[in-house]
Each structure stands twice: as C-alpha cells, then as structure tokens.
C-alpha cells in the first residue's frame, strides 16, 4: 500500500493503545486486546459500527502496559498509524479478550486528546499525504538516488533468499508493482528488525529520512545472508537456514555464535532414533511407516505441535518388542511343584496349566490359549495368573478392566486427537518389553459401556486366536502380533459377559474353598505372611488349627479367604502390641511378687481351655514367651462371634425351609418363610424377588393346590382348596439383597407343604432345584458352590435334581463324606426326603371295574 493514502481518515479517531509491536503503513499485524479501555473500544466501535469509518482506528505504539485500567491515561507516543480493522475474533479463555487483524493506512499526529474514558479519542492530523517526490530539483535528485539504491538492495535481498525460483519471481513482481515511497515501510515490517528500529521508521515523516534509515537495515540483512552462504560451503549443513522475511522463515542460527545445546541434543536424538529404526526388527509395513514419519520429522520445525506427537510415536514404535520374547520353562515336574507351593487345591486349574506346558513341549509354535478364571472373590484368581507367569518364566502384566467404559482404553486413540496414546494392550507390551508375556485381564465381567464405545466389543479381536496375530491399535495404525501372548481373564460371574466375548474364552471355574482347605491355606500362606508383615515370629504367637476353624466358622462366611486374612491381621496387630509392651516393660515382669510363669496366662491348659488375652492386659509378656490364641482370646480381639449356627432355631416351626443359592461371591444358604391368614386367596411375596422367583412361587402353590387331596393338605377351615378364604405370605429374609432365579422352586414348595401339613422340615436339610407345573425337578447350576455353603452352615443332607448327579464329582471328597446327597426327579421325592418319616400319600379310593 502506498504511503500516499487513498483514504481520507477522520479528523477524530479512537485510539488503540498497544505495548507490543509497531504497525507501519502498508503492513498487517495481529494484536491481542485485553485491557478494559481497548475492550470498550472494540465492543462500542468495531462490533456495533456499520460504516467503513467506524472500522478505522488510531494505533498508538510503545504505550506502557498499565497495572490497572483505573489509572490515568499513560503518556502517548506523538506519532501513530491509522489502521483498518479487518477481522475481530473473541475468546473467553483464559480471560475475555479479542484478537484484531489490522492493516496500516497512514501516519497521523495527535493534536489533542478530547476524551479518556471509556476509551481515548483524539483530534489527529493526517501525515504523509505528500506528493511522490518534491518539486525542487535538488531534493528530487537526492530522493531518486536514494530510491534507486534502496531498490537495488531490495532486489539483491530477494534473490539471496533460500526460496524456489517461482517464489523469488513473485517477490520481484511485487517490488516492481509497489510505489517506491511505500517500500521502506513495507520492507521494514517484514525483515528482522527490533521494535525500537521500527519506531524510528514510524517517526520519520520525511520520505528522504525513511530511505536513509532503511538502507542500513537492508545492508545488514544482506551481509548476514552472505556469511551464512559462505559457512554452508564448508559445513554442508542444510538444517541451519536463515530466512529474512518473517511470514516465511526466520534466522534460527547465526554462524559463529554458540550453538543451541537443546537443539543439538534434539538433533542427536533424531539421529539415534533413525538408527534404531534401521536396526529394529519390526515388520516391513511398520518399518515403512517409521521411515516415512522420520522424514516428515526432519522437515518439521520443533515449534510445531505435531513435532512432539510424531517423535513420541516413533519412540514408541522402536521400543515395542516386535520380535523379542522370553524362552518358556517347560519342565512339567518343576511347574507342578511351583504351583503346589504357591496355591493349595485348585486342581482343575493346575491341570490345565500343565496341559498347556505339555503341548508346548510337543509343538513350539502353539498359540497362547485364552483362559477365563470364574469364581467368587478372594479365591486366588489374580494370584494364580501371576503364578502361571512365574511357572512359564514369562513376564507378567495386569490390566484392571473394572469400570472401563471407553473402547479407546483397549484400542488406543487415533493420533489426530490431542493427548492421544496407545491402548492398554500396546502400552503393556511396551512395559514388559517382550511379545509373549502373560496378560491378566482382571474383572472382565465388570466392563462398562458408554458413548465412547463398548470395550467388550474391542476385546473381541484381542481375545480371538484367529485374529489377534493382526491386532491393530488405533494409535499405531499398523498390525502387531498378539498370538504369542497368554491371556488370562478373571471374572466373578459369566452372566454379565457378552456371549460373543464369552465364546472366545475357555472357562475354568474356580470354586470357593472348603473349611479344611481354608485351614491349610491359613497355616501355609496367610499366617506366615501376616507374621512377616507385622514383624512377628512363630516363637511369639501360636494360632492352633481349632482357633483357625473358629475364625472361619464364627467370624467369616465367605467363599474365599480375604476376610480370614484380615482377621488374622487383626490378631497379629493385637499380639504385636503385647510384644512391644513386653520389650519396654521387662523390668516389671521381674517383680518379686510375680510368680514364675504368672505373666503368660495365654497358654492352653491340659483340658484344651485357656485364659483370655485380656487377663494379661496389666502385665505384658516377655518377648520370648509365645502367645497362644484360643476362642476366648478371639472374643477379646475380634469381638463377639458374627455368625452362629442358628439353623435349628429358625426351623423350629412349620412353614420354614432352607434353600441353596448361588451368588458371584459363592454359594449361600437361603431361608424361606411362609405364613397363612384369613383372606381372599392372595399370594404375597416379599424380599426383593425377581420375576423368575415370583413365577416359581406361583408354580409351587399351583402344584400344591392340585395335589392337596393326594397329600391331605387343607387350609385352616379344613378345605382342600388351599386358598379358599386364605391369604399366603412368602418371605425371603435379607430383604436388602436382590434375589432371582429358578433354583428356589423346590424350597418354596417344601416350605408351603410344611405350612399346610403342620409338619416341621428337617433342620439339617437344604435343597435346590427348579420345578415345573407337573412337579418335575429340573437341573440348576452352581452345585459345588451350593454344597460348600451347606457344608459351611453345618447341614448334613442336601437335595439336588437327579440330572445334577454328575456335578457331585466336582465336590471335594471330604465334603461328600460329611454331606448326604439325595437326588430327586420330582417333588414327591423331594418332600419324602425333606421331612422325617417321609411325606405320606393318602391311599386312593378303589376304582370301579366294568366287564361286559
């Protein structure tokens, strides 16, 4: 744009005060507006204006940034630039501000400030509305020489730039098309100059003065380019370039000056990264992608956001274990010993691991199986996965999936997103550093689902042996072979696992422990671990097996051993206090009035009884005397028993029966209570029951009504119509727990039969099974867990469906010896087994025979 402004600016202009940058006529600048005065100017003048005149501002440079807008107007620079506001962009982050794109029109001089608030307005005099050259011959000759000299330097500078031929030609045409008097302002704004130098050019109202001040700036720029070209011939370093014009490139390094250490280190890292790519054993497709990305990285300025993203991507690619693996230990005998030492029981699980080792001995390229351990909490599913990795000699990595509801956690984020990263599978491989680790996918049944996708669906490819050799993470965007990874998933139940995902896994049930197994686990693993954690030794505390049994039966009721472990920890803490007190109070123990051995009353007596620990609260034990924990000590440490054998008490009247239920926490016993009263034949069900269990109750009452005469069942008035003038209420205790499922059918029928017959159900019997309207008993699941629950509760007889007889083989031998299992195919057999003396059938009346 020419210095000779084609626009007549208003005589009164609003002033935009800037403290960074200098706008010259003919140049364009972006500036941020965040002070109160400037914000008022933008909102009142630019955003509400409707004419061209309203978009013209007076830009005053070098204005001090005020500490507060409430202060008086700071001193203003005498010369400013009239500017045209081309664009206004607003934002509220991190605070309200506007970004203006303004173009300089001409110089002006402030004659008088007419208003200071809400934004300053001044009377101005437009400058540099001059003729192109003055009329006097001498001045015209001087300006002509200066103009030619300036133009020559400008052309020389353009031709020395490291640019393509078309770009240089375009700049030449631009120089030729602009008026000579406009060139000083325009070139000053685009070459490397300081704000102080630009301010001097702005103050130079005379055209001759501007030429004289600008020519040295061009010469300085040209000399710098010459020096750079001379250095390049010797060093052949194409990475360090000097670009003079700001919109294109900048001088990043001046030859002869000290090199930027960070830049040199970064260049060294890129060289090392390129070397790692060349020497890596990644597949051909991944290698091509890395070569392409490293070429892009070399051409990027370090200030670009994509530079860091690309570098992180390449570093991940070279760190992944594409072909690095560990050698499996295939000694089956050693593996069996290791598994037995780490875990007690779990024979089915150990058998499957040994089978895998045996097949690996016969076939080296066997694909890793996809195992899923299903069982209640606390039975050791996660620790077994760690033991499997230890047995195989592989690296172990656990991935917690509980609550994960974003498929990107599995597949990763695409690199187009800010903060993108690989998924947990690829990140886990990077962590372990080998391509054949043992991955434990913990709590796979607790995966969520959200708007970000379904992570269970993303696992389909990971857990499919036919597909995971070509697994593609969104972040990598190249295939990675997962076929050598041994995936082990854990779950409490298979009900919440999608069928497609469940079909890809080999399910191995991990049932709860029996009381005998818990005692062995406690004395083999839990007690030594707690002693070590609390700094105790076996010489300081002794927990006999009978005490462990009391903890299991009276203070815990679970399928696993977590609560047992916590109770043992509480005992160790209490003993640690006694031991610590004894170490600090040994002098007290040597008092003459204390007889020998009187301070250790915790030892068991000959008849098996002992004095409680609380007897010695006033007298601490010496550290060498062991403390024996018995039931009385348990009451002092753990409080009164939480569970009692109350089965016989709760079955002391008709209308109560015991059922067996399965939960994700293991098997449980379940009481069913029934009561009848005068009414209109309604059936009331309480206890948070699901639809299936409600239907089982209706089936049971319908079967009993149809067989009332057969068993001589009557209501209170003696009628065989059991619901005639009678209401029935069925209740399932523990009302806060949701209950559902068909396996309570036989229990409900037995409970109602007890109610209407007035007979007591045996107090040592529990039952499970689904019923039909015709009285058949159908098979149910979870027989082993239910049997263990009956065994824990001290029951002696368990009634199961006849078609579940095959499941008895999974029950431990000691449990089968303690329990009497009765199989039933119909409700008649169930009732006969549930009542003492059987449930007799009334004889049918004789039938009339006719013979012709």
UniProtKB/Swiss-Prot annotation:
Residues 13-222 form the Lon N-terminal domain. Residues 651-837 form the Lon proteolytic domain. The keyword Protease applies. The keyword ATP-binding applies. The modification N-acetylserine is found at residue 2. It is found in: Peroxisome matrix. Gene3D superfamilies: 1.10.8.60, 1.20.5.5270, 3.30.230.10, LON domain-like, P-loop containing nucleotide triphosphate hydrolases. Keywords: Acetylation, ATP-binding, Hydrolase, Nucleotide-binding, Peroxisome, Protease, Serine protease. Its EC number is 3.4.21.53. The active site is at 743, 786. One of its GO terms (molecular function) is ATP hydrolysis activity. A motif (Microbody targeting signal) lies at residues 850-852. GO terms for cellular component: nucleus; peroxisomal matrix. One of its GO terms (biological process) is protein quality control for misfolded or incompletely synthesized proteins. ATP binds at residues 375-382. It catalyses: Hydrolysis of proteins in presence of ATP. Pfam families: AAA, Lon_C, Lon_lid, LON_substr_bdg. ATP-dependent serine protease that mediates the selective degradation of misfolded and unassembled polypeptides in the peroxisomal matrix. Necessary for type 2 peroxisome targeting signal (PTS2)-containing protein processing and facilitates peroxisome matrix protein import. May indirectly regulate peroxisomal fatty acid beta-oxidation through degradation of the self-processed forms of TYSND1. Interacts with PEX5. Interacts with TYSND1. May interact with enzymes involved in beta-oxidation of fatty acids, including ACOX1/AOX. Belongs to the peptidase S16 family. HAMAP family: lonp2_euk. This is Lon protease homolog 2, peroxisomal. It comes from Bos taurus (Bovine).
């Amino acid at each position: 744009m020419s210095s000779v402004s084609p626009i007549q600016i208003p005589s009164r202009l609003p002033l935009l005060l800037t403290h960074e940058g200098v706008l010259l006529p003919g140049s364009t600048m972006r500036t941020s507006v965040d002070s109160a005065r400037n914000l008022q100017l933008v909102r009142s003048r630019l955003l509400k204006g409707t004419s061209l005149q309203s978009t013209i501002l007076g830009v005053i440079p070098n204005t001090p940034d005020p500490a507060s807008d409430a202060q008086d107007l700071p001193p203003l620079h005498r010369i400013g630039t009239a500017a045209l506001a081309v664009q206004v962009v607003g934002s509220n982050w991190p605070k309200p501000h506007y970004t203006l794109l303004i173009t300089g029109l001409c110089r002006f001089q402030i004659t008088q400030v007419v208003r200071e608030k809400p934004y300053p307005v001044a009377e101005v005099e437009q400058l540099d509305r001059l003729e192109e050259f003055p009329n006097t011959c001498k001045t015209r000759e001087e300006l002509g020489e200066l103009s030619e000299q300036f133009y020559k330097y400008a052309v020389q500078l353009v031709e020395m730039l490291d640019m393509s031929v078309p770009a240089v030609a375009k700049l030449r045409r631009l120089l030729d098309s602009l008026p000579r008097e406009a060139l000083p302002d325009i070139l000053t704004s685009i070459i490397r100059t300081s704000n102080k130098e630009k301010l001097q050019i702005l103050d130079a109202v005379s055209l001759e003065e501007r030429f004289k001040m600008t020519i040295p700036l061009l010469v300085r720029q040209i000399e710098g380019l010459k020096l750079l070209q001379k250095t390049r011939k010797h060093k052949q370093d194409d990475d360090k370039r000097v670009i003079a014009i700001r919109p294109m490139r900048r001088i990043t390094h001046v030859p002869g000056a000290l090199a930027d250490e960070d830049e040199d280190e970064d260049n060294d890292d890129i060289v090392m990264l390129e070397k790692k790519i060349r020497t890596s054993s990644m597949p051909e497709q991944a290698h091509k992608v890395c070569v392409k990305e490293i070429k892009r990285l070399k051409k990027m300025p370090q200030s670009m956001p994509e530079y860091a993203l690309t570098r992180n991507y390449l570093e991940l690619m070279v760190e992944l274990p594409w072909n690095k693996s560990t050698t499996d230990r295939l000694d089956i005998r050693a593996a069996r010993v290791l598994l037995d030492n780490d875990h007690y029981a779990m024979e089915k699980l150990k058998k499957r691991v040994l089978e895998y080792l045996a097949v690996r001995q016969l076939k080296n390229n066997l694909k890793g199986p996809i195992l899923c351990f299903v069982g209640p909490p606390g039975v050791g599913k996660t620790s077994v996965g760690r033991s499997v990795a230890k047995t195989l000699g592989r690296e172990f990595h656990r991935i917690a999936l509980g609550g994960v509801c974003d498929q990107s956690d599995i597949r990763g984020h695409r690199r187009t997103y800010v903060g993108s990263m690989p998924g947990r599978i690829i990140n886990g491989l990077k962590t372990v550093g080998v391509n054949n680790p043992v991955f434990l996918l913990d709590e796979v049944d607790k995966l969520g689902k959200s708007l970000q996708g379904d992570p269970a669906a993303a696992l389909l490819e990971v857990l499919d042996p036919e597909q995971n050799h070509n697994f593609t993470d969104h972040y990598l965007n190249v295939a990675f072979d997962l076929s050598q990874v041994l995936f082990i998933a854990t779950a409490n139940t298979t009900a919440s696992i999608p069928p497609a995902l469940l079909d890809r896994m080999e399910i191995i049930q991990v049932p709860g422990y029996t009381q005998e197994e818990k005692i062995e686990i406690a004395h083999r693993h839990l007690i030594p671990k707690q002693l070590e954690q609390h700094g105790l030794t076996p010489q300081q505390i002794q927990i006999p097996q009978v005490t462990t049994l009391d903890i299991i039966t009276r203070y815990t009721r679970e399928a696993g051993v977590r609560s047992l472990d916590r109770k043992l920890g509480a005992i160790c803490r209490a003993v640690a206090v006694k031991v610590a007190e004894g170490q600090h109070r040994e002098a007290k123990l040597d008092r003459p009035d204390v007889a020998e051995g009187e301070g250790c009353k915790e030892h068991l007596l000959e008849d098996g009884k002992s004095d409680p620990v609380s007897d010695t609260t006033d007298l601490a034990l010496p550290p060498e005397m062991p403390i024996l924990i018995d039931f009385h000590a348990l009451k002092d440490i753990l409080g009164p028993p939480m569970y009692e054998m109350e089965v016989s008490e709760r079955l002391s009247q008709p209308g109560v029966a015991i059922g067996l239920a399965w939960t994700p926490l293991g098997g449980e016993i379940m009481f069913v209570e029934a009561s009848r009263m005068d009414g209109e034949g309604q059936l009331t069900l309480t206890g948070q029951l699901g639809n299936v269990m409600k239907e089982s109750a209706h089936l049971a009452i319908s079967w009993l009504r149809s067989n009332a005469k057969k068993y001589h069942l009557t209501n209170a008035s003696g009628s065989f119509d059991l619901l005639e003038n009678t209401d029935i209420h069925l209740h399932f205790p523990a009302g806060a727990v949701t209950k559902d499922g068909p396996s309570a059918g036989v229990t409900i029928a037995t409970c109602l039969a007890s109610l209407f017959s007035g007979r007591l159900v045996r107090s040592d019997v529990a039952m499970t099974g689904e019923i039909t309207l015709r009285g058949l008993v159908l098979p149910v699941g979870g027989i082993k867990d239910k049997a263990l629950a009956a065994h824990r509760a001290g029951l002696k007889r368990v009634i199961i469906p006849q078609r579940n007889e095959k499941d008895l083989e999974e029950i431990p031998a000691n449990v089968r010896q303690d329990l009497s299992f009765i199989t039933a195919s119909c409700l008649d057999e169930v009732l006969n087994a549930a009542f003492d003396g059987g449930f007799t059938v009334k004889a049918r009346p004789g039938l009339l025979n006719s013979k012709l």
